[in-house]
Amino acid sequence: MDKYLMDEAIKEALNGIENGHGGPFGAVVVRDGKIIGRGHNRVIINQDPTCHGEVEAIRDACRNIGSFSLEGADIYTTSEPCPMCLGAVLWAGISNIYYGCDRDDAQRIGFRDKVFYDTMDKLSYRLIPTQREQCLDLFSRYQTMPDRKPY
């Protein structure tokens, strides 16, 4: 863990809250000791519930290095990632997550992260399979493409 890198994530969060962009969430993506991506919560300014600090930092890092893979990178974030951000971190191939506040801290100031974690196992009633055969045809078509890039 590097204090300087966490301080940079905190600066990102401050930038966001001081400019009215969203909540107190900032993040930096780091590879080989160098910051390759920065982001802060932009939910309010973009009117987009997916613009969390971690997701914004991942998007920035991917643009900066020209790849959707962030393998070998770490992320420093001001709060424990919500399930959506955790999914993005895993999809990006990020190795380690260093965070400041946890889900209980976020809940205390009005954010619902803990609720999402607590209800993940109860979502089966909302996951309703439909038209699987047609979707499997799409998968087969994609799988036979010579220029496909698995990720």
Put a short name on every predicted segment.
Residues 1-18, 81, 88-151:
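Zinc-dependent deaminase
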Residues 21-25, 71:
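Short, basic and Ser/Thr-rich N-terminal targeting/leader segments
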Residues 24-33:
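Short beta-strand scaffold segments in enzyme catalytic cores
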Residues 36-43:
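Short beta->alpha transition motifs characteristic of CBS
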Residues 47-88:
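Helix-adjacent hinge/juxtasegments
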